[in-house]
């Protein structure tokens, strides 16, 4: 996703990039279908090395964009969780692997795990005029694996996420004019 983000900025002049999609969680306060705004994205591996060399970098969502999304969600009666997410390299890890491999953030306050966030936020951090945000919906939960979410409820959850993203983009574009 990092290369795609660079292309959107360099070739198309995009200034607000919002990653929408699904994530997993092991936070007991989050359930399948909940909407999450990620404040920062910690990488599981060294995928920031091509950009930062030997230095670690944990990119953050742009506060203005995050606040606009938070406000849009609340204006529409959509509850959101706000916190740090982890960006993994592998979606489904083998159960016979050590716990430290299957859940590298256990014991840390990561409210979500997904696979694209760090790349997007690293790319947007490169440009002073570009803002990035991770807006994700919990689709899988390690603690509540028995939560069976009906199709209509999943559609509502994903629609809520998209509504927040589109209204946030509209609001940011309107303010820029």
Question: How would you name each of these model-derived features?
Answer:
Residues 28-32, 48-49, 96-97, 125, ...:
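Short acidic, glycine/serine/threonine-rich loops at helix termini
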Residues 142-177:
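His/Asp/Glu-rich mid-to-C-terminal helical/loop segments that flank catalytic regions of hydrolases
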């Amino acid at each position: 996703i990092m290369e795609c983000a660079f292309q959107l900025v360099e070739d198309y002049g995009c200034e607000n990039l919002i990653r929408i999609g699904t994530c997993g969680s092991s936070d007991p306060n989050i359930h399948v279908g909940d909407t999450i705004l990620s404040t920062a994205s910690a990488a599981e591996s060294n995928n920031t090395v091509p950009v930062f060399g030997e230095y670690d970098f944990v990119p953050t969502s742009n506060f203005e964009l995050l606040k606009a999304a938070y406000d849009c969600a609340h204006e529409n009666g959509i509850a959101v969780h706000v916190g740090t997410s982890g960006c993994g390299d592998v979606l489904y890890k083998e159960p016979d692997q050590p716990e430290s491999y299957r859940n590298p953030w256990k014991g840390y306050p990561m409210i979500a795990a997904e696979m694209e966030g760090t790349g997007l936020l690293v790319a947007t951090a490169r440009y002073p005029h570009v803002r990035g945000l991770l807006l994700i919906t919990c689709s899988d939960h390690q603690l509540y694996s028995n939560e069976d979410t009906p199709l209509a409820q999943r559609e509502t959850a994903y629609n809520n996420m998209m509504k927040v993203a589109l209204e946030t983009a509209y609001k940011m574009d309107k303010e820029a004019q």
